[in-house]
A protein has these predicted regions:
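Lectin-like carbohydrate-binding module/patch detector with strong preference for beta-trefoil
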Residues: 1-181
Length: 181
């Protein structure tokens, strides 16, 4: 797979438009998507999974952090540092598909669920909807409220919570065979 550029923090914080990889520390899985696997939905969506392979920064594993609101309680566009509690979108890079795709969450339903776990489904959406809006939350629930508004550091354990469903992104250890080339 072709390697793509990703961001390195110069000041120890995440910034808008940084390009990052997302990992699940519990399962040691890296978040990846497959534009060859469309999901069954009314909208254009593509499968998302995690891989235990060390693929490095490639088109399917790098996401760009996009600001959702021009002005929020944490500041305006002039503030480039991402803070806990801010709304963010994770967007595909231009190296993998002809248009941007947005990481989204679809709640569990009769026609929408994860392939094996039967839980809510993560997928890449072609449309910018509220289902593609996330907040970055502190991992420790005892300090989650206190950390709202403080800068997010790369490589710091954190949670991604979907704004539309209020569910946290996650993965399990179920093995699904995908052929990534």
């Amino acid at each position: 797979m072709k390697k793509v550029p990703w961001s390195f923090s110069k000041d120890g914080h995440l910034h808008w438009n940084d390009r990052i990889m997302v990992a699940n520390k519990k399962t040691n899985g890296i978040l990846v998507f497959d534009i060859g696997a469309k999901t069954e939905s009314l909208e254009e969506q593509y499968a998302v999974t995690t891989t235990g392979q060390d693929m490095g920064p490639c088109g399917r594993s790098v996401f760009q952090l996009e600001r959702v609101e021009d002005i929020d309680i944490f500041g305006g566009r002039q503030d480039s540092v991402i803070k806990f509690g801010q709304k963010v979108r994770l967007v595909s890079t231009p190296y993998v598909f002809r248009k941007p795709l947005y990481l989204g969450h679809t709640p569990f339903g009769p026609n929408t669920h994860a392939l094996k776990s039967r839980r809510g489904d993560l997928s890449m959406h072609a449309a910018k909807t509220y289902a593609t809006v996330w907040t970055i939350e502190a991992l420790d629930p005892n300090f989650r409220f206190e950390l709202q508004g403080t800068p997010v550091k790369p490589n710091e354990p954190m949670l991604l919570k979907n704004a539309a469903t209020n569910h946290f992104a996650g993965s399990d250890s179920t093995v699904i065979k995908y052929a990534f080339h």
